[in-house]
């Protein structure tokens, strides 16, 4: 994405990517909120907050959220019915009013009484049985898939996801499915190695500058964004940061559920007070449209005519229902670039299966891999595909926009969050396919490096992370921490260290336990050992490296006041980047968009408002 953004500027660029910043933004803005919330963050095992997310079943584990909220009411009603049909329901479950259920206001005993019969139901059924039921009933539940289950997955098979390549029978083909007028663009996939650099022929680029060096790389690019939740908005935030004009379409009558996320009792800002919505939609304009009203759809189509690209992350049937699917729009605007990103893609038997990022992590294999070898899967949190998939979505959209600039033609880009997750685990899939190795949960350990992990330091919940990449690193580490020569020599090879990893970790932990995490990391770094203190959200906010790079940007939100926003991890040498506004209030820019872009006068705008078109 960074390289494509550099190309989009049309100017020579040095592209500077920070691994630290790129990982930071996966926290969905939590670090930027630290000055207001003072929440440093904590681990929660197989739970999210106070409720369990990963549950054991008859032959493995499934992901199911027991949290409240409008978006989960039907889900909770469905699981209650299923448990009751199995004869396991109790009054704590059947008498619960899910429309007002708030897990954060319940005692531990009350939550346990609700969770008990659900847990018993899961233990009666296999992962396959539970997932088939989920698909049939639109239950947001997913199996914690292993490689064998992914290779046999009906949805992935329908979408022709795996291909044979270079001795691997099942290799992820691509995270992207492509549709274009006349099928001019073929689906990407693995190819034979290209020629050596010395044999490559220079290729001229027809991408022209979008503006002067004072303009962002995507300046002049116009994007219309539909959708809800996190994955879509995160992807489009890249473009807003680098100069694109982004208009986000919302509805007052059915607001984005993320606007209700994390709202505590008495929140003075209501739907304008969600920290997470604010963090993910910084830099965008906001327009409210009622897409169930014909004039609302008509206005949306006019804006699509204005836009270079449309981005949406609704369930597949939603845009079809509005008449705003790619097939309908491309008939009128063949140069349209449109990207659709949902949990399992736009086609296939499971395309309409509902779920959040927690279900995506399970379906995509991440839950199976995360945790300790002798314990249940524990995550990763939060919702890894909501953090991972946007990188793929942004990259695909950038490619589509550059293709349009070069050719004048449009394209539809279909990204499945699950497929993006599996694509990221391609080595795991290939290892299973070739060697039959399923892999196990290893905590912080590595199969290739010992030691490799996080070790406790002085203070409350403080750790230092370190790794030895070769035998020389190991010898240096033993000198620093005072391991005797006999022990150091006995463990001088990787094979020996792999066999004695428990012993090694105990020795290191004994040395780190009474030491300050930062001082320990600096001591190890000075000796040439890679080590860092494990940062919490407060540490990240105060990090001098992040401050030097301007990672956090403070803007004044009209209701919440000063808010911290995070940059997306890369800089260009000859194109500025940043945010010119916080997230939009509901309908905040209606007058600007309708008047300045669509040319509607005040009288017409008032009529639209009175007739519910702008709800």
Name every feature range the model reports, one short phrase each.
Residues 1-2, 6-7, 128, 164-165, ...:
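N-terminal helix-loop segment corresponding to the beta1-alpha1 unit
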Residues 1-68, 72-81, 179, 183, ...:
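Active-site-adjacent "lid/gating" segments in soluble enzymes
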Residues 14-16, 141, 246, 286-288, ...:
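Conserved beta-strand scaffold positions in the cores of enzyme catalytic domains, especially
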Residues 33-34, 159-162, 263-268, 354-359, ...:
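Short, hinge-like loop/turn segments at secondary-structure boundaries
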Residues 40-42, 56-57, 64, 95-97, ...:
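Terminal low-complexity tails and localization/encapsulation signals of metabolic enzymes
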Residues 48-50, 173, 273-275, 449-452, ...:
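Short beta-strand-initiation
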Residues 51-137, 141, 451-527, 531:
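Aromatic-enriched alpha-helical interface/lid elements that frame and gate functional surfaces
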Residues 135-150, 246-249, 525-539, 600-605:
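Short, well-structured beta-strand/strand-turn elements
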């Amino acid at each position: 994405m960074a390289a494509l953004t550099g190309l989009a500027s049309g100017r020579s660029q040095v592209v500077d990517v920070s691994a630290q910043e790129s990982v930071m933004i996966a926290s969905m803005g939590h670090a930027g909120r630290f000055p207001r919330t003072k929440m440093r963050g904590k681990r929660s095992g197989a739970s999210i907050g106070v409720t369990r997310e990963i549950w054991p079943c008859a032959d493995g584990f499934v992901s199911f959220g027991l949290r409240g909220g409008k978006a989960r009411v039907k889900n909770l009603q469905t699981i209650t019915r299923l448990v009751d049909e199995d004869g396991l329901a109790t009054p704590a479950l059947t008498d619960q009013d899910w429309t007002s259920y708030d897990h954060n206001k319940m005692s531990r005993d009350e939550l346990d009484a609700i969770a008990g019969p659900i847990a018993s139901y899961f233990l009666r059924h296999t992962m396959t049985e539970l997932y088939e039921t989920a698909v049939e009933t639109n239950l947001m539940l997913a199996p914690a898939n292993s490689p064998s289950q992914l290779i046999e997955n009906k949805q992935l098979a329908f979408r022709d996801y795996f291909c044979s390549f270079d001795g691997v029978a099942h290799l992820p083909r691509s995270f992207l499915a492509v549709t274009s007028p006349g099928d001019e663009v073929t689906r990407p996939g693995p190819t034979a190695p290209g020629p050596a650099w010395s044999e490559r022929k220079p290729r001229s680029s027809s991408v022209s500058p979008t503006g002067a060096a004072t303009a962002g790389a995507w300046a002049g690019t116009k994007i219309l964004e539909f959708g809800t939740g996190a994955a879509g908005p995160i992807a489009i935030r890249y473009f807003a940061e680098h100069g694109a004009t982004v208009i986000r379409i919302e509805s007052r009558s059915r607001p984005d559920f993320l606007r209700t996320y994390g709202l505590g009792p008495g929140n003075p800002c209501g739907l304008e007070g969600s920290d997470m919505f604010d963090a993910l939609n910084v830099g965008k304009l906001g327009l409210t449209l009622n897409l169930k009203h014909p004039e609302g759809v008509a206005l949306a189509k006019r804006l699509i005519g204005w836009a270079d690209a449309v981005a949406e992350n609704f369930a597949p049937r939603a845009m079809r229902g509005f008449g705003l699917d790619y097939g309908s729009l491309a008939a009128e605007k063949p140069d349209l670039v449109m990207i659709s990103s949902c949990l399992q893609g736009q086609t296939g038997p499971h395309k309409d299966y509902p779920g959040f990022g927690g279900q995506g992590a399970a379906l995509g294999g991440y839950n199976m891999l995360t945790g300790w070898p002798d314990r249940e899967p524990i995550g990763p949190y939060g919702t890894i595909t909501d953090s991972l998939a946007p990188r793929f979505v942004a990259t695909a959209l950038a490619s589509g926009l550059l293709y349009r600039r070069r050719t004048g033609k449009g394209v539809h880009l279909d990204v499945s969050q699950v497929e993006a997750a599996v694509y990221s685990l391609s080595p795991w899939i290939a290892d299973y396919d070739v060697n039959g190795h399923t892999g196990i949960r290893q905590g912080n350990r590595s199969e290739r490096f010992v030691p490799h992990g996080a070790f406790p330091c002085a203070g409350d919940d403080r750790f230092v992370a370190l790794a030895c990449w070769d035998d020389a690193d190991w010898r240096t580490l033993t000198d620093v921490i005072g391991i005797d020569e006999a022990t150091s020599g006995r463990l001088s090879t990787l094979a020996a260290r792999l066999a004695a990893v428990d012993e090694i970790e105990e020795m290191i932990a004994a040395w780190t336990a009474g030491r300050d995490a930062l001082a320990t990391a600096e001591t190890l770094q000075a000796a040439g050992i890679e080590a860092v203190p494990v940062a919490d959200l407060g540490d990240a906010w105060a990090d001098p490296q992040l401050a030097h790079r301007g990672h956090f940007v403070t803007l004044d939100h009209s209701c919440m006041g000063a808010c911290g926003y995070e940059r997306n991890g890369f800089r260009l040498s000859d194109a500025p980047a940043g945010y010119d506004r916080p997230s939009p209030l509901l309908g905040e820019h209606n007058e600007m968009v309708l008047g300045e872009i669509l040319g509607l006068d005040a009288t017409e705008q008032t009529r639209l408002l009175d007739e519910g078109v702008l709800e």
